[in-house]
Amino acid sequence: YFEKFTENNCVGIIYNEVEALSKLTGDYNFTNLCAATSLGLYFGIDFHLIKKAIEEYTPTNMRSQIVKKGDKTLVLDTYNANPSSMKVSLENFNDFIGTKTIIIGDMLELGEESVTEHSQILELAKSLSFDEIITVGPHFKEVNVSGVAFLTTQDLINYLTENEIHSQNILLKASRGIVLEKALEFIK
């Protein structure tokens, strides 16, 4: 009934041979497009109006928000982070074409499982094809002993004022409390 396609790292939906390309990344958002399209069609909305809505929607709430900075594409996903959302984000970002840097911040409120969960996410990140892995926060700093790790977002900002990230694609993913989005303006 619906088919998926991707273009420029964004996911789209095909219905009756008509394509609607969203500004959302990730296969997981295809499910959301299918649900929204199904509801619209159920209530009698013409697919061309649904297509227009899909193509015009721009995420602005730090949830898989795509930000262009010069020749770089940044994925700002700093509204929330937990082990399952971090895993999906990393796996999705791994499929991006071009060079890739991830800046991942702590997943808060994990309690006794924090060290284990941060270690597993770091190991997953290392197993994927990222050119650079940067971590932010005390939990990741504890487990990222041999990599680029910062205790705070301010420490990352201090680093970014002196150093450029050369990747074409950059993912920023963290829990809200890390306020990783503050680093966005310092990425050159």
Regions found by a protein language model. Name each.
Residues 4-12:
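A short, compositionally biased
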Residues 8, 18-188:
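ATP-dependent carboxylate-amine ligase
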